[in-house]
Every structure is written in C-alpha cells, then in structure tokens.
Amino acid sequence: MQQFLHSMKHYAIFFAVIAALTYVLTLVLGADKVDLDKYSTVTITKGDTLWELSNKYHNHHHLTTNEFVKWVEDVNDLNSDTAQSLSPGDKLYIPVLKKELHNQVAIEQ
C-alpha cells in the first residue's frame, strides 16, 4: 500500500508539472499575438520602403524607425529580403491604430 501511495505521489507531481508548463507556454506564446483588427493597413505604392512608411506615419506611432520596421516585418511575416522587395499593391499592417488615422482624417476635413 505504501508503494502504491508513493507511486501516486509521483504521478501527481508529474501531472502538476505538465499543467504548470502548459500554463506558462500558453502565456508566453499568447503574449506575442497582435490583435490586427485594431491596426491600420497600407497599400504599397512604387518606391515605398518600410523606413519611409515609418517616417510618413511618425505622428501616429511611438516607435523608433527600427522598431517600426521590425514590427511590420514580424506581423506581416516578412524577412529582410522580402521587406526590401515590396511590390505596388501589397497590403501591410502597420503599428498605427485605426482610430489614430480616423481621427487625423476627421481633423483634416
């Protein structure tokens, strides 16, 4: 009987560790998710670069140019090569809240 209890104790510890790891992984992996519905999209025109987009929208975000570029690359699954070869018509999410651009348009009208 004592051996059975000892064995059950090991199973309980094992399952507690698995549950804790699952919880931590859920928090860590879920933290990187971005709610894209909140962010603006832009349509690339000829000659656009991520650096130019950062400068164009600098009044609407609080990132450095490098942070802006990194955010756009990460969220849009771009690497440095694909970021260099943007094509007119490509649509990209940018780290500018939709409400920020909406407010700007309302002010200008």
Curated annotation (Swiss-Prot):
Keywords: Cell cycle, Cell division, Cytoplasm, DNA damage, DNA repair, Septation, SOS response. Its main location: cytoplasm. InterPro entries: Cell_div_suppressor_YneA, LysM_dom, LysM_dom_sf. PROSITE patterns: LYSM. GO terms for cellular component: cytoplasm. It is found in: Cytoplasm. GO terms for biological process: division septum assembly; DNA repair; negative regulation of cell division; SOS response. Residues 40-94 form the LysM domain. The keyword DNA repair applies. It comes from the Bacteria. It holds the Pfam family LysM. HAMAP family: YneA. Inhibits cell division during the SOS response. Affects a later stage of the cell division protein assembly, after the assembly of the Z ring, by probably suppressing recruitment of FtsL and/or DivIC to the division machinery. Belongs to the YneA family. This is Cell division suppressor protein YneA. It comes from Priestia megaterium (strain DSM 319 / IMG 1521) (Bacillus megaterium).
